[in-house]
Amino acid sequence: MTVTAVNVLLSLGVAALAVAVWKAVVMVIQIATSPLRNIPGPPNSNWVYGNLKEIFAAENSVLHEGWVAKYGNTIKYKGWLSRNRLFTVDTRALNYILSHSNEYQKPALARYNLGEVLGEGLLIVEGEQHRQQRRIMNPAFGPAQIRELTEIFVEKAQKLCLFWRNEISKSGEPARIDVLNGLSKMTLDVIGLAGFNYEFDSLNIDGKPNELNQAFSVMFRSLEGFAIVFPLLKALIPPLRLIPDGRSRRIAKARKVMRRMGMELITKKKAEILRAAAGEKEKDNLQSRDLLTLLIKANLATDLPESHRLSDEDVLAQVPTFLVAGHETTSNATAWCLYALTQAPEVQQKLRDELWSIPTENPSMDELNELPYLEAVVRETMRVHAPVPSTIRVAMTDDVIPLDTPFVDVHGQVQDSIRVKKGDPIFIPILVINRSKALWGEDAFEFKPERWESVPDAVQHIPGVWANQMSFLGGPRACIGYRFSLIEMKALIFALVRAFEFELAVPPEEIIKKSTAVQRPLVRSEMVKGCQLPLLIKPYHTV
């Protein structure tokens, strides 16, 4: 090692140490002065991990629900390095937090780790940059646009049916199939075509992974494992980001591929749009209706103020954003739907009867939306098995959060609001709210699609963008693609439940939910295999 290299490393080490000491001092001051210290909650389990180890060891949200039962609607628990973290199920407080997106933003730690993989796309940016991106992207996710894309959803759902029929023909029926694997392939193919008219061809039995598919796989695996020690330290201590590691190199290589291919797509689409504007008639087909094309069209509109336009870099950042947001959540939600149907055979058959009541294998968006029991099954799946069980916000300024239900602080004083200090983290309990007995009744944990025939009045106060639940959040940062996801999910369930009968391949107690950013199924006795949902599948034969 040269003298120069040694000096550089020493300089980085000194800088990293200085930043670490400074951050430690700031954190100690925040812990000591945060108003959250006066809120009741569970005892600290560990100085370094706080209560996080026990949270990660438990099923998603189970521990939080126990804390609510013991300590009340508004509590605090300990996060990294014993930092206080606010947790409330008060719907007025949650509505306030979600509707004030400037004052309550994603934490810098999460933004860095996600941003390293995804770039500065809609999932990452905050404030005016987020509003600018969302303003341009909103039209691409409207009902009319999703209606045009439904054909892709149905086509790929039918291709998944063929994919599974091929597996059944090889092993006999019923065949044990990991449905999560097939659903992930299907949703990746959908977002490729519907997102930017690119064919991943994941469901092609004889196909080979293409370059963009491989790059996305590398980036997605990096997202799954971001909470390891060195990436965590790099997020907390910026000078460490200058030190390369294997994960960073893999991400950089994959992003280089994605950037090159993304810019090729953007350049091609811009040229096509400009040619059409110059007088060449553009073909009115699905190729011109993908989300990226619609985004570029909106961005090139002549009546759009220059200050509202996105740069090519901003447009490019939406490619990995589309892939991640439009792929993993829908595949997992549909997997949990199939799981729920195996645990309620009468619901599965009632749903199948409804799906066979319409005389087509290629339903439109309107036909899918006119099936009431399918709607109820999707709503109940998203309520009980929310793909994203929680999220985090950080107070960007000192503030006072209003409450519906007062709490008694550690000094015995009744408080009708929550005081927070700049930097205080806040846990947003999506799944806890979705299955709160106080809101939904004593059967809140049960999968009962019939509940949607008459929902309790209390759920009207839940601050969600859809169906009186928080699965797609609410406020200015509510999921922009929720209509896309719901119609894709309906198309999948329509095709699969018409075509097959499903049973769980292992005892129900073997299925557990992995506590990650997205709620994934695992088999308790087969953890080494990673996320999977093995079902016994056989073709359904009409009488």
From Swiss-Prot:
Entry's transmembrane regions: 9-29
Glycosylation, residue list: N332, N434
Domain of life assignment: Eukaryota
Record keyword Chloroplast present: no
GO MF term list: heme binding; iron ion binding; monooxygenase activity; oxidoreductase activity, acting on paired donors, with incorporation or reduction of molecular oxygen
Amino acids binding heme: C479
Pathway: Secondary metabolite biosynthesis
Major location (coarse): membrane
GO cellular component: membrane
Protein's UniProt keywords contain Glycoprotein: yes
Compartments in which it is found: Membrane
Protein EC: 1.-.-.-
Top EC class for this record: oxidoreductase
Keywords, ordered alphabetically: Glycoprotein, Heme, Iron, Membrane, Metal-binding, Monooxygenase, Oxidoreductase, Transmembrane, Transmembrane helix
The protein's required cofactors: heme
Topology with respect to the bilayer: Single-pass membrane protein
UniProt xrefs under Pfam families: p450
PANTHER family: CYTOCHROME P450, CYTOCHROME P450 12A4, MITOCHONDRIAL-RELATED
Family recorded in the similarity comment: Belongs to the cytochrome P450 family.
Record's function text: Cytochrome P450 monooxygenase that is able to use 7-ethoxycoumarin, carbazole, phenanthrene and trans-stilbene as substrates for oxidation.
Protein name: Cytochrome P450 monooxygenase 169
Organism from which the protein derives: Postia placenta (strain ATCC 44394 / Madison 698-R)
